[in-house]
Amino acid sequence: RYSGLDEITTDNVKNLKVAFTFSLGYNKGQEAAPLVIDNTMYIVSSYPNVLYALDLTKPGAPLKWKYEPKPSAASQGVACCDVVNRGAAYANGKLFFNTLDDFTIAVDAKTGKEAWRTKMGDINNGETMTMAPLVMKDKVFVGDSGGEMGVRGWAAALDQSSGKIVWRAYSTGPDSEALIGADFKPFYDSDKGKDLGVSTWPADAWRQGGGTVWGWASYDPDLNLVYYGTSNPGPWNADMRPGDNKWTSGIFARDADTGQARWFYQFNPHDIFDHDGVNENILVDIQWKGQPRKVLLHPDRNGYLYLMDRVTGEVLSANAFDYINSSTGVDLKTGRLQYVKEKETKPNEVVRDICPAPPGAKDWQPSSFSPKTGLLYIPHNHLCMDMEEVEVGYIEGTPYVGANVHMKPGPGGHRGAISGFDFMQGKEIWSVKESFPAWSGALATAGNVVFYGTMEGWFKALDAKTGALLWQFKTGSGIISQPTTYKAPDGKQYVAVLSGVGGWAGAIVSGQLDKRDGTSALGFVNAMKDLPDVTTPGGELYVFSLP
């Protein structure tokens, strides 16, 4: 999420103008990052997941081709949190992306012709796919969505040439199906033992246990390891699933070729609050206490920024980046998150003012690390909730939640922020408050500029060192996507972002939900009742450059 381009700087960013725009034609939540390869920009829309190619060599970047996968309309009915898609990946002349109805597709980047299509899941049991694939060597890494539908999470690698599934690893169940074998050496004792994906669950609960893989994955070519997070256990009613509920709400390191697990760490054992573990893992090499370390940075929904040794899985530090009252910290000796008993949810009893809420102190929206400033730029939420556990039964293909939730703003009344965080010192350097959750990704550049968008539709540029606002532009709809920057054929630097409010946070607008029902969108509507007053649905690409 960092670019070495530096034509746009803190001094001249105020002069940015719109270079061109493009309508996606679908007014749902747009979470994708525009992808630029060989003078062509590629964009994947929300459902129906149309892939567009724009010609950057011509004025106005006209449409070169579009590919329409025509996913099943029924997939919209089982999507948890809007019909979003987080974008495409590229390698060896092909574009790879997922459809809401569980296909991974490869398309020829020059012609837009389908190369292969592989069915990965089944919408009839509640599975969907929303993540952006990750390219690693000759493979494509993908995973499923549907943690609120009682599905069983998995991650898989496909052959780039043929689309054949090379390996698939489940997030729950016996070691043989989780691809846990002799090479598995977790750092902490609580992750050691045989078939923990079964024994840390009651009876056969692991079969509907969640642990979906819908967020971000990272690949270290030197170690040949892929790192990815697993989502919440199902259902949200934690009393129905006593135990740690392995291997949910944590991070796996796996051999990219075989899928065999090397280590696992659980951010949220026996996840009580739907805090998952799917957020981004940023790979950095640093000096830590006088020793070189290969580390990863993981800002989790539970509100802690984890600094981890990515070779061993050891937690080196875990520092809060937003307000937390549901836990007191992470025990670095055991690796365990320390829950606050008074905030633990209970059956048929409302526990009030739990912070952070289920979307966490940040959700999927990716942060950005700048090696120039040494800061991590974290777009995050500032939300609390009232929560009550209720009994729920599993019916295939239907919601499997078991909780009543009402979210609300955190202390101070704002609902989001973006901050510059020094992970070496474990402290925030600056923070900019936002009225709504900062649901877009962050982009840092070598020009010491940080770009991000707001749910009202403002696209903003901040000084990377101080957080000072340098420039902003009002787009037609709220921004929940990932800004990107690129060097065009004319040699100039451009910045691109999709506008189109939605996602879990913006479902009240994109789904036209009734604000009187505060439990709608899994309780998010209660915190977003005023969002329809400031933005409307959309689906538009905006690209900016200097004059």
Residue ranges, per PLM feature:
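Short, conserved, GDST-rich strand-edge loop motifs in beta-rich repeat architectures
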Residues: 142-154, 201-203, 228-245, 382-411, ...
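Beta-propeller blade signature
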Residues: 107-112, 153-164, 244-260, 308-313, ...
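C-terminal structured "cap/appendage" subdomains that terminate the fold
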Residues: 302, 443-538, 542-547
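Repeat-solenoid scaffold signature
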Residues: 128-164, 271-330, 343-355, 359-364, ...
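Hydrophobic or amphipathic alpha-helical targeting/insertion segments
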Residues: 56, 87-119, 125-171, 176, ...
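Extracytoplasmic beta-rich repeat domains
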Residues: 22-33, 66-89, 117-132, 170-216, ...
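Repeat-blade elements of multi-bladed beta-propeller folds
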Residues: 29-50, 77-104, 128-148, 205, ...
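N-terminal cofactor/phosphate-binding cores enriched in small/glycine residues
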Residues: 2-121, 445
